[in-house]
Amino acid sequence: MESEIGCGIDLFFGGGTFDFIRQAQAGRIVDSGVLKRHPEWFSDAVIPQRFAGEEYWDREGRWIGTVLSAYGMVFNRESLRRLGFPGEPTRWEDLTDPRLRGEVALADPTKSGSIAKAFENIIQQQMQRRLRELEQDQVGLPAAERERKAVVEGWLAGLRLIQLAGANARYFTDTSQKPPIDVASGNCAVGLCIDFYGRQQEEAVKRRDRSDRVGYVSPVGGTVSSVDPIALFRGAPNRAVAEAFIDYVLSMEGQKLWNFRVGITGGPDRFALRRLPVRRDFYAQADWKAWRSDPEDRPFESNDPLIYRAAWTGGLFREMAFIIRVMCLDPHTELISAWKAILEATPERRAAALAVLQDLDAVAYDEAGGTVKRALMSRNKVDEVELGSRLGREFRQRYERAERIARGEAP
């Protein structure tokens, strides 16, 4: 493609890599030349091409990651103390704690791509954990079989975790920006969110109320760091200025703006951005730690990193969101009621009812890649509607049965 006909806009900036890859494939974004102007930036020591399974820049220079995004939990310390929750949440499993019943804020993964990605991270962590267990316990099993077993079992473990988080949820909202706001106001105690929504809410409360009641955490080993890229549009009317801006954003001066505190030399003048720079050498500057908004965050250093494997769930992203909807959102009233009954039941009834509640064979890994995928890819949209209706009905009936068992009304 040699044409310089464009849309009249210079830069495409922000969001996840998915849209940038699509625009690159369509020929709408082009090589900005930054790889040639600053080859010293594009190495494992500065901006690695790949890290933990995620791509950080396009080898043809069409898009470059500028800042990192991860997922985690925003929480209200005052609400947690009121509920008797010990300390602060640190693991995805904390979303299932019975003390948080009715206090978790979640978003609909079929409406929010960022929240769907967070749910995918939860499932991937369970798969990775299961693989490590099998590598220890079933050494004689061929590697391919171990991986297959880990993926299938980890898929169910992840869905079960999400199901109980959904049982604790006050709601599933259409917008991923709502949970941090509700957590800050005390309407919910914990919310699932993208990192900068949580950190910016924490910053806003500190600035406005001079309060530390809001916090944010990315679970260790529970989330990957993906990038928000920048790209040059084909036919950019102000190409020289746009290229200079790309260079600035990736320079150390530009990177400081993302995470330096307000008033610090090199930092923002009015508002802290609370984003994590993409440059690995930024975190190597020990003397900058006191000037950073998030001095303890070191995304390139982890004893238990989550390595994203697209082959495991990347092809089931839409199917996963659909399954969470029919499992948690559509029968939410029945799920909440069953969970309440289970928590109030005797130990024996609780175990029996929970086994029924968490029987997810209908949405197992092979079903997701088979029945569910076929319905979602069908040209006849009625197929998707009918499957959603059938699965939603089956989950409602399952939850009602689990509740009856918990209350001693069914065998």
Q: Model-predicted segments: where are they?
A:
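C-terminal non-catalytic accessory extensions
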Residues: 335-411
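Extracytoplasmic ligand-binding site segments that recognize negatively charged/polar headgroups
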Residues: 8-173
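A bilobed periplasmic-binding-protein/Venus flytrap-type ligand-binding module shared by bacterial periplasmic
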Residues: 74-79, 225-239, 257-258
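Periplasmic-binding protein-like
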Residues: 138-140, 159-165, 209-236, 281-283
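Mature extracytoplasmic/periplasmic domains
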Residues: 233-303
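Hydrophobic residues within well-ordered alpha-helices
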Residues: 23, 182-184, 232
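A ligand-binding cleft/hinge motif common to bilobed small-molecule-binding domains
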Residues: 19-22, 190-211
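Paired acidic/hydrophobic, glycine-rich loop segments that form the ligand-binding mouth/hinge
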Residues: 9-14, 172, 189-195, 200, ...
